[in-house]
Amino acid sequence: MAFTFKQFHIDDLNCGMPVSTDGVILGAWSPLSQAQQILDIGAGSGLLSLMAAQRSLGRITAVELEEKAAAACLYNMVQSPWADRLSVIHCDIQDFCQQTQYHGFFDHIICNPPYFEHGPQANDSHRAMARHTNTLGFAPLLDAIIQCLTPQGYASLILPSQSMPRFKACLTSSKLHLTEEVLVKSVENKAANRVLLLLSKNRQSDYRQSELTIRGIDGLYTKHMIELTRDFYLKL
């Protein structure tokens, strides 16, 4: 399927996970404006990389394990206005992190990680790979962030609320700290089902927690959601 945003176009036909609201929210929320070197882990179609290119002047490196998704990501990058600042590498993030030139290299890392921790996988192997933590668990993801992030850098993630206890357990035993947390509600009168996270290597005293509601009880986007995504969605 193809998606047209205000400044770029995404073709995600060969990607395990299509363009999602989760990805758009993460790409719009992450503090990227000052970043010079950005790493997109598990890039898929390249949505987050392209959003990062629109929102910053930095260079973006995307890493994608699945071959067809990496090809789609490259295609979308080449078609964009920022092709000279975008690149994709087809490899496992753990192999990527073994390359010493990337140690402590990126001042922002962004990732919409796999989110099914267990249970039956999708019939389509590409979709299964994108959706299940079997291919990238939380501990290896945090290790990759620690290796590649600069001392003063940040990492932005979005996770299902139900995954937070296990994620925070892994975080506690890592060298990363939770700086900001946004509880995301799909509808105004529902409990939060997603969480936006900002991580850093430095423990900060101004930890922040807030909420984002995507739609009101009338089914329309909230003012907050419109303000967050208006630079991307065509109809806002």
Swiss-Prot record:
Subcellular compartments: Cytoplasm
Pfam families: MTS
GO molecular function, one term: nucleic acid binding
Claim: tRNA-binding is one of the keywords in the record: no
Catalysed reaction equations from the record: adenosine(37) in tRNA1(Val) + S-adenosyl-L-methionine = N(6)-methyladenosine(37) in tRNA1(Val) + S-adenosyl-L-homocysteine + H(+)
Primary location: cytoplasm
GO cellular component: cytoplasm
Keyword set, alphabetical order: Cytoplasm, Methyltransferase, S-adenosyl-L-methionine, Transferase, tRNA processing
Gene3D superfamilies: Vaccinia Virus protein VP39
Annotated GO biological process: methylation; tRNA processing
EC number from the UniProt entry: 2.1.1.223
InterPro entries: DNA_methylase_N6_adenine_CS, SAM-dependent_MTases_sf, Small_mtfrase_dom, tRNA_Adenine-N(6)_MTase, tRNA_adenine-N6_MeTrfase
Similarity comment: Belongs to the methyltransferase superfamily. tRNA (adenine-N(6)-)-methyltransferase family.
Protein's name according to its UniProt entry: tRNA1(Val) (adenine(37)-N6)-methyltransferase
